[in-house]
Every structure is written in structure tokens, then in C-alpha cells.
Design a protein with these regions (language model features):
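S-adenosyl-L-methionine
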Residues: 1-101, 114-148
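Short, solvent-exposed loop/turn and secondary-structure capping segments
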Residues: 75-78, 125-127, 162-164, 202-204
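Short beta-strand element of Class I
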Residues: 110-111
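Conserved proline-anchored active-site loop of SAM-dependent methyltransferases
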Residues: 63-77, 138, 147-165, 190-196
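Short, conserved catalytic or adaptor-binding loops enriched in Gly and charged residues
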Residues: 99-106, 127, 214-217
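Class I S-adenosyl-L-methionine
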Residues: 78, 121-125, 129, 141-148, 161-238, ...
């Protein structure tokens, strides 16, 4: 959580990369201890059963999806895969026939999805099928995340959005730590983390810098890029 400016306070933005990594590792270890402390034998067994149901196919891109919602970001990744294999001009035509769409996206496999909202999980299952292992727990209750090649997630942004109050101390603004915790366990080759434009200007850009440093400290080369949904076939400026 945020700390107030006090005598002797040192902004973590002034830390050396090794110090940032040490701070991040300690924070992740702290969160993992809290997760275990609040778990029970029953919940731990349920998680083991969940992992046992995950299918790992060879020669496909295995995807873990966090804060999944109805799967909009996941669909975008599937369309991106189609753009690579069949050309960008043809990718949207596959949406007209679901059977053809699924046939041409067999080389990408969504193995696990996590979202706390029941309605979102129902929609996600309708969109992506029953083969995806759905986890409806709060991400802070997940002890271990499955291995993956790609991780997706649009972590919550109530304090980052221009459409609502910009609250630095909103606890939901710090769920990105659990996204990074998932990265360190799942060890994907690459990841996509989506958020709102307001994240780039909050606290004069210092929040984005901090988050970027943490993702970098987890062992990834990070590039922040602003896009507009209207440029990708969505009928809205977002």
C-alpha cells in the first residue's frame, strides 16, 4: 500500500534494478505467505484437483488468462494468431463460422482462466468452451498458477480510470502484484497486461513507471504502448 512522505522516505523509483527486484521478491513472498495462511486443506485439495484437470497439449501455445471477464482480450489474441497464419485481411472472416474459427485456431490453447465475477465466468465459458479450467476465486486466494507460454490479464483499474475516482490507496489498484506473482510461478515466455489510458498519467506517470519496473524485475523486457480500440474493429473510441 502507498506510504506517506516521511523523513528518511526513499522513493522506490530511485532504487537500483537489483534493489527493485529484492523489494518485489519480498512483496511476492509476503503475499504468498498470506495466501497460504488463509487457505484450508479443503481449498488446497480443490486447487490440486483443478490443476489435474488442466490439459497440456504439445506444439500449441498454452495461455493462462487472468481477470478474464468475458474473454475480450483472449479473443483478440486468437484473432492475432489468425492474422499471423491467414493474413490480417482474412482474420475477421473466420468469425462468421465458429467451427471454421475453432479449426483455424487449434495452435493456441487457453488452459486456465481466473475471474471473481460469476456472470463473467458464464460468458467466458460460452465463448471459449468447457475445456478451459475456470477458477472463480479471488486471485489473492490462488496458491499456485499453472505453467504457460503466454499470460494475459487486464488487472482492475478503478483508481486509474478517468471515468471514476483516481484513488492511489484503492486496494484494487495493487492487484497487479498478484499478476506478477502469477508470472513468477507460471513462467510464460511473454505476457500482455492491459489497462486504461489513465494509468499513464496517474501521479504524473510515476505509477506506470513503478509498475513497469516491477514487471521488469520479474525478468521481462517491458514495452508500454497506447492503442485505441477503434483501430482494431471495435465500434467505440476507447
Amino acid at each position: 500500500t502507498p506510504r506517506t512522505m516521511q523523513s528518511g522516505f526513499r522513493s522506490s523509483l530511485t532504487y537500483a534494478p537489483e534493489e527493485v527486484q529484492d523489494v518485489l521478491n519480498k512483496k511476492i513472498q509476503e503475499e504468498e505467505r498470506e495466501t497460504l495462511r488463509h487457505s484450508t486443506p479443503v481449498t488446497r485439495q480443490l486447487e490440486r484437483d483443478m490443476h489435474a484437470n488442466i490439459r497440456y497439449q504439445k506444439n500449441v501455445l498454452k495461455v493462462v488468462s487472468l481477470f478474464s471477464g468475458a474473454g475480450g482480450l483472449d479473443l483478440g489474441v486468437k484473432l492475432a494468431m489468425l492474422s499471423c497464419t491467414g493474413g490480417a485481411e482474412n482474420s475477421l472472416t473466420f468469425l462468421a463460422d465458429r467451427q471454421n474459427f475453432e479449426k483455424n485456431t487449434k495452435n493456441i490453447d487457453f488452459i486456465y482462466s481466473n475471474d471473481i465475477f460469476p456472470a463473467a465466468n458464464v460468458s467466458y465459458t460460452a465463448n471459449f468452451g468447457l475445456d478451459v479450467v475456470k477458477d472463480s476465486r479471488d486471485i489473492r486466494q490462488v496458491i499456485e498458477f499453472p505453467d504457460s507460454d503466454l499470460m494475459l490479464g487486464g488487472f482492475p483499474c478503478p483508481g486509474f480510470s478517468a471515468a471514476g475516482p483516481r484513488l492511489l490507496d484503492d486496494p484494487r489498484n495493487f492487484l497487479y502484484i498478484h499478476y506478477i506473482r502469477a508470472l513468477t510461478q507460471s513462467k510464460p515466455t511473454f505476457f500482455i497486461a492491459e489497462n486504461v489510458k489513465g494509468l499513464m498519467t496517474m501521479a504524473r506517470g510515476q505509477v506506470l513507471k513503478q509498475i513497469t519496473e516491477y514487471f521488469s524485475a520479474a525478468g521481462y523486457q517491458v514495452v508500454a504502448h497506447l492503442v485505441n480500440a477503434r483501430d482494431y474493429g471495435v465500434p467505440q473510441i476507447r
